[in-house]
Amino acid sequence: MKPDVLLYNSQHLINNITLYQLNHINIASFSFVFFSGLFTSFSPCLISILPICIMYISGEGQKLSQIDKLKNLFFFCLGAISSFTTLGLIATLLAKTYSQLFNGIPVISALVIIYMGFSLLNIVPLSTNNLNTRINNTNQNIKMYLSGVGIGLAISSCSTPIFVTLLIWVTSNHNLFIGLIFILIYSIGYIFPIIIGSLFSSRFLTTASSPFLNNLWAPFSGTILLSAGTFSLFSSILKY
């Protein structure tokens, strides 16, 4: 079985178990939502940008103290989690009026994944110069927070169908508070590899700096993203 097909089937299996846990809430449900986020993080989107995130948080080329690195990690993760919870809140509120909103999320996420794949393969440009200029002129904490928000918005496109299941559950049960707690726990699980990688950044940076990884990581990640995004796009279209 191809890796993208295996990943797709595994996500749907976890999605079904998550839905069962949401409909039979207990203490284990909260831990399972966390592990659902952790499992979903092993997707082409997050894996492809994981080295970039860790090097950015750790201040590659800068002599940052451990306290500064922890502060960077905190505000970066706060931004990423904020983007997830804000997306969840907006989608939930809009879904009360626009119930067809959720139907388009898998298609949009697939297109974002495909674009990220093309950008890693240098087929299409991913211009961030203007954004970087604006961010560099701000406070370091705000800079890390805004970077986390941007990364959170980008990688959230790879969190379907489990993230969509959470949103639909919140909407159908009209329990926004518990729903936001689930989304918060899920988002922490989703960015957990970034947290672990940043805490052990010294070892990671030594490995990531090898010429072999530098030359092969981008094309490998781009190919995986393009394959997974295309498969997800056609799967979503065929459902209509």
Swiss-Prot record:
One of its GO terms (biological process) is cytochrome complex assembly. It holds the Pfam family DsbD_TM. InterPro entries: Cyt_c_assmbl_TM_dom (IPR003834), Cytochrome_c-biogenesis_DsbD (IPR051790). Its main location: plastid. GO terms for cellular component: chloroplast membrane. The chain crosses the membrane at residues 32-52, 74-94, 104-124, 149-169, 176-196, 218-238. The keyword Endoplasmic reticulum does not apply. It is found in: Plastid, Chloroplast membrane. Keywords: Chloroplast, Cytochrome c-type biogenesis, Membrane, Plastid, Transmembrane, Transmembrane helix. It comes from the Eukaryota. The keyword Chloroplast applies. It is a multi-pass membrane protein. Belongs to the DsbD family. Could be involved in cytochrome c synthesis. This is Putative cytochrome c-type biogenesis protein DbsD-like. It comes from Porphyra purpurea (Red seaweed).
